[in-house]
Amino acid sequence: MSKVCAVFGGSRGIGKAVAKLLAQKDYKVAVISRNLEVAQAAVTEIGAHLALSCDVSKENEIQCTFKEIKNNLGNIDYLVNSAGISRDALLLRTRSEDIMSLLSINLVGTIQTCKVALKGMIQQQGGSIVNIGSIVGHKGNIGQSIYGASKEGLIGFSKSLAKEVAKRNIRVNVVAPGFIRTDMTSDLKEDSLNKMIPLGRFGEPEEVAQSVLFLLESPYITGHVLVVDGGLQLHL
């Protein structure tokens, strides 16, 4: 029987690549985005099964989203949290509303989706969660103090949750990408940054998706942070 996977932030970038790979592996995939039309377009393009809209900063929308997935596809086996935003600025120039948005979407939203997903996973005595972090959470970066805090907070949350639910046969892991060629990195000077990366190039979303799939399916890995950065951390 095909496993059911919910991919938050699954309409673009890394999340879309994950959803596409899971659909190719014959999983039942729900693509969740804040924009329903964008989610529907992604589902049509990649051959997923269900498109839903959800603002992860709103708990009631998360609850409704999981109910829709269960009603249409069944109990969720895999959860991937790839929804996220960036608002790069030096801390002294960062607006208070941007601080709250970054933490609300990148960290609290993931915490809330995990909390709701766990109810079903505990009932079925098993499940796997992969949260998308960032190398910035590990190493820090100028102009990304709040973004980095949200991603490092995600790592601490995931490791603690992994300890809480391991006895329930539920695994929780993190993939921490470096520079990946997506909309979020389109304004970066790729040629100069490539010099910092031992492998000499930005990664592709599909390469991160392979790492996500590996952690979702690995039955004896939990509480792990898998860095996918072409060796960038060796230079930071």
From Swiss-Prot:
Designated gene of the protein: cbr4
Protein name: Carbonyl reductase family member 4
Sequence positions that bind NADP(+): 11-14, 34-35, 55, 82-84, 147, 151, 180-182
UniProt-annotated binding residues for substrate: 134
InterPro entries with a match to the protein in the record: NAD(P)-bd_dom_sf (IPR036291), Sc_DH/Rdtase_CS (IPR020904), SDR_fam (IPR002347)
Superkingdom of the source species: Eukaryota
Protein function: The heterotetramer with HSD17B8 has NADH-dependent 3-ketoacyl-acyl carrier protein reductase activity, and thereby plays a role in mitochondrial fatty acid biosynthesis. Within the heterotetramer, HSD17B8 binds NADH; CBR4 binds NADPD. The homotetramer has NADPH-dependent quinone reductase activity. Both homotetramer and the heterotetramer have broad in vitro substrate specificity and can reduce 9,10-phenanthrenequinone, 1,4-benzoquinone and various other o-quinones and p-quinones.
Subcellular location: Mitochondrion matrix
Pathway(s) it belongs to: Lipid metabolism; fatty acid biosynthesis
Complex and partners: Homotetramer (in vitro). Heterotetramer with HSD17B8; contains two molecules each of HSD17B8 and CBR4.
Biological process (GO), any one: protein heterotetramerization
A single cellular component GO annotation: mitochondrial matrix
EC number(s) recorded for this UniProt protein: 1.-.-.-, 1.1.1.-
Active site, per annotation: 147
PANTHER family: 3-OXOACYL-[ACYL-CARRIER-PROTEIN] REDUCTASE, SHORT-CHAIN DEHYDROGENASES/REDUCTASES FAMILY MEMBER
Similarity-based family: Belongs to the short-chain dehydrogenases/reductases (SDR) family.
Single GO term (MF): oxidoreductase activity, acting on the CH-OH group of donors, NAD or NADP as acceptor
Keywords, alphabetical: Fatty acid biosynthesis, Fatty acid metabolism, Lipid biosynthesis, Lipid metabolism, Mitochondrion, NAD, NADP, Oxidoreductase
Organism expressing this protein natively: Xenopus laevis (African clawed frog)
